[in-house]
Regions:
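Conserved histidine-centered catalytic loops in small-molecule metabolism enzymes
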Residues: 31, 80-122, 234-250
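Generic structural signal for well-ordered alpha-helical scaffold segments
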Residues: 71-75, 167, 171-182
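Short glycine-rich phosphate-binding loop at a beta-alpha junction
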Residues: 82-89, 185-192, 197-201
Length: 250
């Protein structure tokens, strides 16, 4: 897909009837698109993960031994260049990022040399409200909970976040990626270069919903992100709310 994208972008630019003087910025060309690789990482294991408790905005850290758990992912990402790094502002994600992309790599340019990681509240897990910290067994006899299990788009946890609000903040995050990606290429550059990579350290529900929003045929349960697991998505941005994506094998 990377080669096809580069070839298509090259053809679109070379075949433009405009002269060099008349060429316009990318964002004024309605037929163009912008490409990137998203690397979506779920945080490492917490106590509540181990106890199978709902954990939304509660701010728990990782269990002891997280460095060992995340070592394979750290080795996978070592030396990869990221144009941007985004991270949920909750502790479990911040600690995960510190392990998989150590500060020494950031300052040395091993993984990122131009920008510090951005802490992003829009990448938080769904807020479960009063159900945060509870297990299925604690809630299974609550009628509202059972209704929420069947129709989370219609039911909101008490004191929690509606599904609409959850989806909207993720859509706004994707739109901000589009705006940043367009701004990268106000003038044509090397159209055969690989698309930039963006690292996103976030939560299982966020990864599921982003894949559901981006990839045709995916629903919320198509993925089951494990703690410390990464998913790579080749993403084409054709405009606000207009995305084409493909999950890469891993």
């Amino acid at each position: 897909m990377k080669q096809d994208i580069a070839a298509k972008r090259t053809v679109e630019y070379v075949q433009s009837p405009n002269s060099q003087e008349d060429k316009v910025p990318y964002d004024a060309k309605e037929d163009l698109h912008w490409d990137m690789e998203l690397v979506l990482v779920r945080h490492g294991t917490t106590l509540w993960n181990k106890e199978r408790r709902y954990m939304g905005h509660s701010d728990l850290g990782l269990l002891p031994g997280a460095e060992q758990e995340l070592k394979p992912l750290q080795e996978e990402l070592q030396g990869q260049s990221f144009a941007r790094i985004y991270c949920s502002d909750l502790m479990r994600c911040r600690q995960t990022l510190q392990i998989i992309v150590p500060e020494s790599e950031l300052t040395s340019g091993g993984s990122l040399s131009t920008m510090s990681p951005m802490m992003e509240p829009r990448l938080r897990e769904l807020h479960f409200g009063e159900w945060d910290g509870k297990t299925y067994d604690m809630l299974k006899d609550v009628s509202l909970y059972r209704a929420w299990i069947d129709e989370p788009q219609r039911i909101t946890p008490p004191g929690g976040e509606s599904w609409t609000d959850f989806v909207n903040r993720l859509r706004k995050f994707l739109d901000s990626l589009y705006e940043w990606r367009v701004a990268m290429e106000v003038q044509p550059m090397d159209l055969t270069a690989a698309p930039p990579s963006v690292l996103v350290v976030t939560h299982g529900g966020v990864i599921r919903q982003l894949a559901c929003m981006l990839i045709p045929g995916h629903d919320f349960w198509s993925l089951n992100p494990k703690p410390g697991e990464a998913f790579r998505i080749q993403l084409r941005l054709a405009g606000p709310h207009n995305y084409i994506a493909e999950m890469l094998p891993h």
